[in-house]
Amino acid sequence: MEGFLLNEQTWLQHLKEKRLAYGLSQNRLAVATGITRQYLSDIETGKVKPSEDLQQSLWEALERFNPDAPLEMLFDYVRIRFPTTDVQQVVENILQLKLSYFLHEDYGFYSYSEHYALGDIFVLCSHELDKGVLVELKGRGCRQFESYLLAQQRSWYEFFMDVLVAGGVMKRLDLAINDKTGILNIPVLTEKCQQEECISVFRSFKSYRSGELVRKEEKECMGNTLYIGSLQSEVYFCIYEKDYEQYKKNDIPIEDAEVKNRFEIRLKNERAYYAVRDLLVYDNPEHTAFKIINRYIRFVDKDDSKPRSDWKLNEEWAWFIGNNRERLKLTTKPEPY
């Protein structure tokens, strides 16, 4: 932890300065750490010396209130079908891009006969009205489309409103929650699934561990992924170690990765539509994302003296879903094509 590298006086000064910079009262930080306000006051004035464990707890609690937000949400997969065969109308009126900028190919996917591509933005078309025009944006496609939205001075909300007004049918929507502080311990969550400490309407989960048989600082470099729910259903969750993915794809050292873990809410068809509608009605990503998560799962701590339904909510999970942290924000990360 950052504070452990500093001498005691500097550590205390740094703690207080950071708390004030984050706009936090002593009481709010104390409650989040599980101590009294008076005890925190005594720590800051040097009257008592906190243990190393308490120092670590204070830093972790403090970072949860980081104005830069320990959690952020992105759109990471968007697939929409339009009930028309007029591809130009979809591209120029809905995407608000020039069809002439797209590369045309006389083959398609998902039984479509042809497609247009601009970087990772795909528009599939068919002469059959029941297929219509399909717009597909995977992860990179979403980031590239955000560059165009920025130039158009439009937001995702305005785009989705245009989609629904035009009769667009949501086929898939992935909401990605980036965990920048490593609060989601995926091996622990996997173990909780195995120990029946995941209370869920889902009936299945799958976990994978992949990696290289190399050692970095005496540790195997591995990545963990946890799927909760059936991959064939209209809603399921995928939780994985994003830092390991970035190491594998881009050779970014794991310790330097901006995002530690990612929690993906994967929605299809009607579930995707209701999520978009909820976002447009409430303009509150926190409300939309965690309403879905809380509807389907919660992680608890086993207590053999109580019925399973009365087991206490796991503390780290409670923080993830909203206890004592700043509100989740919808962010964009525009990337040029």
Feature locations, PLM:
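Structured, helix-rich domain cores that form ligand/interaction pockets
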Residues: M1-T10, E17, A21, R64-E335
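Alpha-helix N-cap/N′ positions at the starts of helices
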Residues: T10-W11, I35
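The alpha-helix within a helix-turn-helix
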Residues: R19, A30, W59
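Short alpha-helical DNA-recognition segment
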Residues: G23-D42
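Short, conserved catalytic or interaction motifs in soluble domains
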Residues: T45
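DNA major-groove recognition helix of helix-turn-helix/homeodomain DNA-binding modules
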Residues: E52-D68
